[in-house]
């Protein structure tokens, strides 16, 4: 079997406030991905500036940091075959108006500034984001009893 990879997924403050945490986790679990870490926290502005450092020169950066700091987030690490790419497909487009029904953003969002969820856009970004949000000992290694029913 091919190597499993990990991705970082964060439910943003609007997703938390709207009670979508369970629905989002359910979708990743039902797909067959394995949750290996999860935190419920209010991220500091400095932490968020580091997370979004690639966007620091964009005009929306201050508003993005303020929005992400406006309430709690659920930070997660999911593992599975092609989880980065598949996770991004499950999320839908960054702009919910461009997202298809059946995707998280297509089903639950209207505006880009309130798009409820973040997902790593590459394996390299995932590694960086996981390292930023979690200590190595917070990533739990276990074999899911469903593993053999999901993977050949």
Swiss-Prot record:
Reactions mediated catalytically: a 2'-deoxyribonucleoside 5'-diphosphate + ATP = a 2'-deoxyribonucleoside 5'-triphosphate + ADP; a ribonucleoside 5'-diphosphate + ATP = a ribonucleoside 5'-triphosphate + ADP; ATP + protein L-histidine = ADP + protein N-phospho-L-histidine
EC number of this enzyme: 2.7.4.6, 2.7.13.3
Active site per database record = 118
Which cofactors are required for activity? Answer: Mg(2+)
Expression across tissues: Expressed in the base region of the oxyntic and pyloric mucosae.
Recorded hits in PROSITE patterns, A to Z, give: NDPK, NDPK_LIKE
InterPro entries annotated for this entry? NDK-like_dom (IPR034907), NDK-like_dom_sf (IPR036850), Nucleoside_diP_kinase (IPR001564), Nucleoside_diP_kinase_AS (IPR023005)
User: Which residues are listed for ATP binding in this entry?
Assistant: 12, 60, 88, 94, 105, 115
Q: What does this protein do?
A: Major role in the synthesis of nucleoside triphosphates other than ATP. The ATP gamma phosphate is transferred to the NDP beta phosphate via a ping-pong mechanism, using a phosphorylated active-site intermediate. Negatively regulates Rho activity by interacting with AKAP13/LBC. Acts as a transcriptional activator of the MYC gene; binds DNA non-specifically. Binds to both single-stranded guanine- and cytosine-rich strands within the nuclease hypersensitive element (NHE) III(1) region of the MYC gene promoter. Does not bind to duplex NHE III(1).
Entry protein name: Nucleoside diphosphate kinase B
Q: Which organism was this protein described from? A: Mus musculus
Q: Which gene encodes it?
A: Nme2
